[in-house]
C-alpha cells in the first residue's frame, strides 16, 4: 500500500500544479476561478475531479497502510513509524487547507470551525487564532496563506516520504509472520515492479470511475454556494475521511476537551511502539489482539457513520 500512496501523491502534485496555474487565491475570485477551470480550461473539469477525488483514495490508502502496520507490528521500526505518523498529520493538514481553496460555503465554515479550535488553548488561544487568520475572521489573508500552505505541504510530504523510505531500508520491511525474510529476497524488477503496477491499475480504476461517473458523490453540495460569512450552513461537517475525528470532537461537550480528544485520536499512534508487550511481532498468531484490532476498525467505521 506504500507504493499506492506514492502514486496518489504524484498524481495529486501533477493535477495540483495544473490547477494552481488557473487558480486565483482571492476571496472575490477564488470561487469563479475554480468554475472557470471546470468550464473553460481544456480538460479542466477532469483535472479538478481527479484532484478532488484523489484525496479520498489517498486517505483510503493511508488508513489501510496504518492498519496493516498496526496488525503486523511494523511500528517496531520506530523511526519509520514516527515519520509515518508525521506524514499522516501533514496529509491531514494539506487536505484541510486544500478544502478551503474553492471558497464555497463548506470551505469557509469548515475553515472557521477548525481554526477556531485553537482558541480553546488556554491563555494564548485567541491570539493564536487571530494570528492564523491574519485578522478577526476567516478572510482574504486566510485564503492566500492557505493556498501557499497547500502548495508547499505536498512537497514537504514528498521529502518526508524519502526519509520514511530511507529509515525503512535500514532494516528492510516486515512480513506477515514477523520473522526475518532475508532468505526470501527477490529482485525488485520484474517481481515488485509488476506487483506495484497491478496495484496502480487497481487504484486508478476506481479513481477514474469516480471522477468520470459521479465526481460529486463524496463532496458536499453546500460547496456549490459561494462563501457567505452571514449565512451558516445547517450542517457543518468535513469530508468523509475526517468524520471519525469530527465525531470525537463533537461528542465531548467541552471545547478544550473535544480538541484534546481529537488530537489524541491521531497522536495516540506515537504511543503504539511503546505499548508493544508481546514476544510475537505480528498479530497473525494472537487471536485476542486480533479481536481488539478488528474492534478498533469497527469503532472507526461506526464513528465515521455517526459523524455524518
Swiss-Prot record:
Cofactor(s), by name: heme b
Single GO molecular function: ubiquinol-cytochrome-c reductase activity
Membrane topology of this protein: Multi-pass membrane protein
Keywords per UniProt: Electron transport, Heme, Iron, Membrane, Metal-binding, Mitochondrion, Mitochondrion inner membrane, Respiratory chain, Transmembrane, Transmembrane helix, Transport, Ubiquinone
InterPro entries associated with the record: Cyt_b/b6_C, Cyt_b/b6_C_sf, Cyt_b/b6_N, Cytb/b6-like_sf, Cytochrome_b_C_euk/bac, Cytochrome_b_N_euk/bac, Di-haem_cyt_TM
Residues engaged in binding heme b b562: 51, 150
Subcellular location: Mitochondrion inner membrane
Cellular component GO terms, alphabetical: mitochondrial inner membrane
Keyword Metal-binding: yes
Cofactor binding notes: Binds 2 heme b groups non-covalently.
Membrane-spanning residues: 1-21, 45-66, 81-101, 146-166, 194-214, 256-276, 288-308
Binding site for a ubiquinone: 169
Superkingdom field: Eukaryota
An example Gene Ontology biological process: mitochondrial electron transport, ubiquinol to cytochrome c
Cross-referenced Pfam families: Cytochrom_B_C, Cytochrome_B
Oligomeric form and interacting partners: The cytochrome bc1 complex contains 11 subunits: 3 respiratory subunits (MT-CYB, CYC1 and UQCRFS1), 2 core proteins (UQCRC1 and UQCRC2) and 6 low-molecular weight proteins (UQCRH/QCR6, UQCRB/QCR7, UQCRQ/QCR8, UQCR10/QCR9, UQCR11/QCR10 and a cleavage product of UQCRFS1). This cytochrome bc1 complex then forms a dimer.
Misc. remarks from the entry: Heme 1 (or BL or b562) is low-potential and absorbs at about 562 nm, and heme 2 (or BH or b566) is high-potential and absorbs at about 566 nm.
UniProt function note: Component of the ubiquinol-cytochrome c reductase complex (complex III or cytochrome b-c1 complex) that is part of the mitochondrial respiratory chain. The b-c1 complex mediates electron transfer from ubiquinol to cytochrome c. Contributes to the generation of a proton gradient across the mitochondrial membrane that is then used for ATP synthesis.
Name of the molecule in the record: Cytochrome b
Amino acid at each position: 500500500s506504500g507504493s499506492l500512496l506514492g502514486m496518489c501523491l504524484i498524481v495529486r502534485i501533477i493535477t495540483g500544479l495544473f490547477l494552481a496555474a488557473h487558480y486565483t487565491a482571492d476571496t472575490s475570485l477564488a470561487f469563479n476561478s475554480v468554475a472557470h477551470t471546470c468550464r473553460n480550461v481544456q480538460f479542466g473539469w477532469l483535472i479538478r475531479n481527479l484532484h478532488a477525488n484523489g484525496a479520498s483514495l489517498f486517505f483510503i490508502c493511508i488508513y489501510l497502510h496504518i492498519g496493516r502496520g498496526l496488525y503486523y507490528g511494523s511500528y517496531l521500526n520506530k523511526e519509520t513509524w514516527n515519520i509515518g505518523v508525521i506524514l499522516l498529520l501533514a496529509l491531514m493538514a494539506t487536505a484541510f487547507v486544500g478544502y478551503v481553496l474553492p471558497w464555497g460555503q463548506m470551505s469557509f465554515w469548515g475553515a472557521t470551525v477548525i481554526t477556531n479550535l485553537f482558541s480553546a488553548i488556554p491563555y494564548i488561544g485567541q491570539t493564536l487564532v487571530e494570528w492564523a487568520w491574519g485578522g478577526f475572521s476567516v478572510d482574504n489573508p486566510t485564503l492566500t496563506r492557505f493556498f501557499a500552505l497547500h502548495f508547499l505541504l505536498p512537497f514537504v510530504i514528498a521529502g518526508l516520504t524519502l526519509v520514511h523510505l530511507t529509515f525503512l531500508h535500514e532494516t528492510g520491511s516486515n512480513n506477515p509472520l514477523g520473522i526475518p525474510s532475508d532468505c526470501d529476497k527477490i529482485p525488485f524488477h520484474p517481481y515488485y515492479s509488476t506487483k506495484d503496477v497491478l496495484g496502480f491499475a487497481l487504484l486508478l480504476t476506481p479513481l477514474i470511475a469516480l471522477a468520470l461517473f459521479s465526481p460529486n458523490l463524496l463532496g458536499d453540495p453546500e460547496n456549490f454556494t459561494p462563501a457567505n460569512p452571514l449565512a451558516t450552513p445547517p450542517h457543518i461537517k468535513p469530508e468523509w475521511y475526517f468524520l471519525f475525528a469530527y465525531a470525537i470532537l463533537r461528542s465531548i461537550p467541552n471545547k478544550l476537551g473535544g480538541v484534546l480528544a481529537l488530537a489524541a485520536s491521531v497522536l495516540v499512534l506515537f504511543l503504539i511502539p511503546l505499548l508493544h508487550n508481546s514476544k510475537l511481532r505480528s498479530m497473525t498468531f494472537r487471536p485476542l489482539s486480533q479481536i481488539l484490532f478488528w474492534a478498533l476498525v469497527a469503532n472507526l467505521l461506526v464513528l465515521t457513520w455517526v459523524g455524518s
